[in-house]
Amino acid sequence: MKKVKIVYNPNSGERSIVNKLDCIIETYQSYGYILIPYRLNKQNPIKDAFIDLNEDYDHILISGGDGTVDMVLNVMKELEINKPIGILPTGTANDFANALSLPFNVKESIENIINSSPKKIDIGKVNNKYFINVASAGMFTDVSQKINTEFKNSMGRVSYYIKGIEEALHLRGFNIRVHSDEVIYIGDMYLMLVFNGKTA
C-alpha cells in the first residue's frame, strides 16, 4: 500500500483539523493509502516529520494555513525532499489555497489530490527562505505572528484586520535594499510585498 505523510498544525483555523482527522484517514484508506500523521508543536522539530520518509510515500499532505505550508516547504527544501505536496486548507486565511481555487471540503479536497496528477508551481526565495504565497517586509507584515492564538481562533480573519488597525497607529517607513536579477532598489518604503498568489 502507498503511504501518505500528513503534517498538520492542530492550532490552525480554530483547531478545525482535530474534528476532521477521522474523515481524512477514512477517505485515504478507501483509496488504498496508509496515512502517517505528524502533529506540529513547539516541542517536536518539524524535521522529525520526515525521518522515516522513503520511496513508499506517494506525497506529503500539509494541513494548516499559509504559515504551516511555508514552514513545511522550507524544511523540505532544506532536506532536499522532492515529493509532491497536497494542501488541505484548514488555516484561518488560506490565501494560497484560495489562489489555486482548492476545495475547502475535506473529502472533496482529498479526492481532488488523489485523482489529479502533480503540477509544478513557482516558489520564491528571499535570502535563504523560500515562500509559496507571499514575501513581505515592513508595516503589517508580522501581524499574524503578533496575534494571540486564542484570539485568532475565536475571531477568525477579523483578528488580522483588528491587529492591522492597531499597527497602523505606529506607521513609520524604513530603509530597504532590494536586489534581484531585474532590478536594484535602495530607498525608503512602508511596505513591500512579493506575491506568488493573488492575495496576502
Q: Residue ranges of each PLM-predicted region?
A:
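Helix N-cap/beta->alpha junction signal
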Residues: 64-65, 136
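Catalytic core of DAGKc-family lipid kinases
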Residues: 7, 31, 38-40, 78-194
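Short, intrinsically disordered, charge-balanced linker/junction segments flanking boundaries
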Residues: 198-200
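Short Gly/Thr/Asp-enriched flexible loops that form oxyanion-binding sites at enzyme active sites
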Residues: 68-80
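Generic hydrophobic alpha-helical membrane-span motif
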Residues: 15, 72, 95-97
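Redox-cofactor binding/interface segments in oxidoreductases and associated redox assembly factors
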Residues: 62, 70, 194
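ATP/NTP phosphate-donor binding region
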Residues: 1-63, 74, 108, 183
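Short, glycine/acidic-enriched loop or turn micro-motifs at the edges of active sites
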Residues: 12, 69, 92
